[in-house]
Swiss-Prot record:
Protein name: Potassium-transporting ATPase KdpC subunit
Location of this chain's protein in the cell: Cell inner membrane
Residue ranges of the TM segments: 6-26
Record's keyword annotation contains Ribonucleoprotein: no
Molecular function terms from GO: ATP binding; P-type potassium transmembrane transporter activity
Keywords in alphabetical order: ATP-binding, Cell inner membrane, Cell membrane, Ion transport, Membrane, Nucleotide-binding, Potassium, Potassium transport, Transmembrane, Transmembrane helix, Transport
Function description: Part of the high-affinity ATP-driven potassium transport (or Kdp) system, which catalyzes the hydrolysis of ATP coupled with the electrogenic transport of potassium into the cytoplasm. This subunit acts as a catalytic chaperone that increases the ATP-binding affinity of the ATP-hydrolyzing subunit KdpB by the formation of a transient KdpB/KdpC/ATP ternary complex.
Any GO CC annotation of this UniProt entry: plasma membrane
Disulfide bonds, paired cysteine numbers: none
Homology family: Belongs to the KdpC family.
Amino acid sequence: MSQLRPAVFLVLLLTLITGLLYPLLTTTLAQWMFPQQANGSLLLEQGSVRGSAPIGQSFSRADYFQGRPSATSDRPYNPLASSGSNLAGSNPALDQAVSQRVAALRAANPQAGQQVPVDLVTASASGLDPQISPQAAYWQADRIAAARRLPREVVKRLIDENTTTPMPAFLGEPAVNVLALNLALDALQR
């Protein structure tokens, strides 16, 4: 009995700390310090949720920028099935998939240069990457400009406005969030 009392006390104390106090503290701090991120980094358009900034979406229409291919298994950009393709660089299946993606992109973007940016044909490690390089966005600019009947310079300006550079710069490369860029295109034509 003398050993049971401290054991029960510790179980109750740790349950209180880890089950109530710690979650309340971290939630309160997150809401105070990072409210946008703590609530899912949601991107809104006219009061409606259009997506979450850190999760990519599938865009197939000619008047929208396309992101990186998704490696999620059942449907593109499914956050519940996040994974990479796990295909080695020497795997013939990866070579075939990339070749098919290059052919499809060249067919959809006949006015673009011959060199297809690598991030448009390879999936990210998570399969959910929402960003592409500015070069990949510029590569698609002619198609977007033609489909939306906009001057190419307007499309390039939108790409520049939606390009983010990490601070400090040595922590990564400039990137463009595809969903944010497509929402900016929609807002421009309202």
